[in-house]
Every structure is written in structure tokens, then in C-alpha cells.
Amino acid sequence: DIYKLPRIWTGIPELDKVIGGLFFGQVTLLTGKRGEGKSTFMSQLMVEALDQGYAVFAYSGELSDYHFKRWLDFQAAGPDNIATNTNVYGDETYLITNPVIEKINAWYRGRAYIYDNGAMDMEDELEGLLETVENVVRRVGVKLVCIDNLMTAMDVGISDNLYQAQSAFVHKLKRLAVKHDVAVVLVAHPRKTKDSFTNDDVSGS
């Protein structure tokens, strides 16, 4: 009975009603045009998983680990714990006070992990990422793996082999998800820029 299977709820009732949440052993592809909030939504999923008692792991190829953590901190803090400030140019900025950060860090401790994408050379990053994911899943029991995004997780240039390499990478993620019974969320950008797109326009699909 699929309704009895364990899963991670997204926290969005309308979405959970349609997809049933994030099931363990599956890879969920998250796509959309640039600037539509894919990375923000992924960080929301991580906070939801943590709130449900699951350990999480994230890779961001576009943000350094400390920038990604700051992004995640704002999701974890929520609007009631975010302060406003005015910078020297008169613009309103947002910040999280140190006491709130300390509480968030304590909440993360032993349960939230971010990949340091400066730890190895680009040519080793793909295999290094997959190896790190498998190690952290085995050692600390991570149940949600988030990768943002498919292109930056790979070292393959634009060539005839690009889509084959993407498919191979996704296949490895799928095997990892099944082997360790974890949920994987993979952010992928559309191949083309247009008003609408199909599955064939999504890298790795």
C-alpha cells in the first residue's frame, strides 16, 4: 500500500496531495526557469525534513558552503526570527541575530551536512561528490540528499557526450537512492530558454 510507505512530506499540502511527498529510494527532479525559486524550494524541503526528524545533505555548485548555509538559515529561522536593518545606502536588509543563529546551529548539529565544493579539484568532483554522499548516508544516516544542480555537479563540457553523461550521473544517483533507501532531490535547468518546456527539455531527464 503506497499510502503506508514512509516518506518526507514537503510541507505544502497541495503538492503532497499530488505527489504524495518525497519517497525513499527515489530521485525527484526539480526544474523550472532561472530565478523561479528552485534553490529556495530545495532549502525549504531540507528544513521540512529536519523538522520531521530526518538528517539531510546538500551540494550546491553555485554557492559556497557558507553562502548556502546562510540561505538555509533564513528558511529555518522563519519570518518571526528575521530582523531588518538599513545599510549605508538607505536600503533595507535582512539579518538573523546571533542568539537565533546559535539556536539554529544547535538544531542542525549532527543532522545537517553541506558539501564543501572547494575541497577537491574539478576533475575529481563528480566521483568525489558521489563518494561523499554514500559515506555520509552510511555513517550518519542521512535520509534526504539535495543536489543543486545537475550541470555544476558534473565536469563534462557542452558536447555530444553531455546528455549521456547526465543520464549516467542520474542513474548512479538512482542506484544510490535504492541501495540506501534515501530520498534524492536533483535540481536541473531546462536545456532551452522559452515560455514552456517538456520533459525532453530538462537536462538529465
Language-model features: locations:
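Short, basic, glycine/proline-bearing loop/turn elements
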Residues: 3, 28-32, 111-119, 159, ...
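Conserved inter-motif catalytic segment of the P-loop NTP-binding fold
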Residues: 54-159
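Helix C-cap/helix->beta junction micro-motif
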Residues: 52, 140, 179-182
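The Walker A/P-loop phosphate-binding site
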Residues: 1-80
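Aromatic/hydrophobic pocket-lining residues that form π-stacking "cages" and hydrophobic walls in ligand
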Residues: 45, 133, 173
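Phosphate-binding/switch region of NTP-binding enzymes
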Residues: 14, 18, 35, 61, ...
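Non-membrane alpha-helical structural segments and their capping/turn regions in soluble enzymes
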Residues: 39-40, 126-127, 160-167, 171
